[in-house]
From Swiss-Prot:
PANTHER family named among the record's database cross-references: PHOSPHOGLYCERATE MUTASE (PTHR11931)
Top EC class of this enzyme: isomerase
Residues given in the record as substrate binding sites: 8-15, 21-22, 60, 87-90, 98, 114-115, 183-184
Record family assignment: Belongs to the phosphoglycerate mutase family. BPG-dependent PGAM subfamily.
Pathway field: Carbohydrate degradation; glycolysis; pyruvate from D-glyceraldehyde 3-phosphate: step 3/5
Catalytic activity: (2R)-2-phosphoglycerate = (2R)-3-phosphoglycerate
Any one Gene Ontology BP term: gluconeogenesis
Site (Transition state stabilizer): 182
The organism of origin for this protein: Caldanaerobacter subterraneus subsp. tengcongensis (strain DSM 15242 / JCM 11007 / NBRC 100824 / MB4)
Official protein name in the record: 2,3-bisphosphoglycerate-dependent phosphoglycerate mutase
Active site: 9, 87
Length: 249
């Protein structure tokens, strides 16, 4: 049996401000730093250790991983960063407040933009300063690989090749792996691992800073999964994620 730990980054400054973030490179909030520390502490308490770590090229995930590895005294292990683990690209919504957007377009539309597997938010244009092609960290990507917007399927289509080519072989080689990434890149991976339908994935909310453990068989098919959190805390944090896209009076 293999184990892999999935961890959504701690609360970011834009999570705190309830903004669509996507590929915008915002840092952790003070609460997010504390969430990452707590994640590291609970992993240590439960006896977890790691031989390799994977994360995105966005600092909220990278810093979460650093903090966790620091708590575990594992800052020396190899860390592999890939744009393929980035958050889903939210197109022209990036930077907008989710509740204000829900007020303007309706909660149902915003839920589709946030949670649907197939609906894409309005796209960026290439002359928009937010276009990732202007960012040196994506200099090696072809123009086709740089998104102007993404739905969850698009996100899955970049996450899963990286899982299959790089992460899965690392796990199969016997290395203990942690993946620190984002709400939607992890939802995409969970959809793939658990073979969830497009309808089922709409209702899945992954909270910030709570380790999610997958136990996998020899073919890396899930045996079971569980969060390292008590039921009450988990439900509260999942509900907070679900509420983000609702209009406020």
């Amino acid at each position: 049996m293999y184990k892999v730990v999935l961890l959504r980054h701690g609360e970011s400054i834009w999570n705190m401000e309830n903004r669509f973030t996507g590929w915008t490179d915002v840092d952790l909030s003070p609460k997010g730093i504390e969430e990452a520390k707590q994640a590291g502490k609970i992993l240590k308490e439960k006896g977890f250790t790691f031989d390799a770590a994977f994360t995105s090229v966005l600092k909220r995930a990278i810093r979460t991983l650093w903090i966790v590895l620091d708590e575990l005294d594992l800052m020396w292990i190899p860390v592999y960063k890939s744009w393929r683990l980035n958050e889903r690209h939210y197109g022209a919504l990036q930077g907008l407040n989710k509740a204000e957007t829900a007020k303007k377009y309706g909660e149902e539309q915003v839920k589709l933009w946030r949670r649907s597997a197939e609906v894409r938010p309005p796209a960026l244009t290439k002359d928009d300063p937010r276009y990732p092609g202007n960012d040196p960290r994506y200099a090696d990507l072809s123009e086709d690989e740089i998104p102007l917007t993404e739905n969850l399927i698009d996100t899955i289509n970049r996450v899963i090749p990286y899982w299959e080519s790089t992460i899965a072989p690392t796990i199969k080689s016997g290395k203990r792996v942690i993946i620190a990434a984002h709400g939607n890149s992890l939802r995409g991976l969970v959809k793939y691992l658990d073979n969830l339908s497009n309808e089922e994935i709409m209702e899945l909310n992954i909270p910030t800073g709570i380790p999610l453990v997958y136990e996998l068989d020899e073919n890396l098919k899930p045996i079971r999964h569980y969060y390292l959190a008590d039921e009450e805390e988990l439900k509260k944090k999942q509900q907070e994620v679900a509420e983000q896209g609702k209009a406020r009076a």
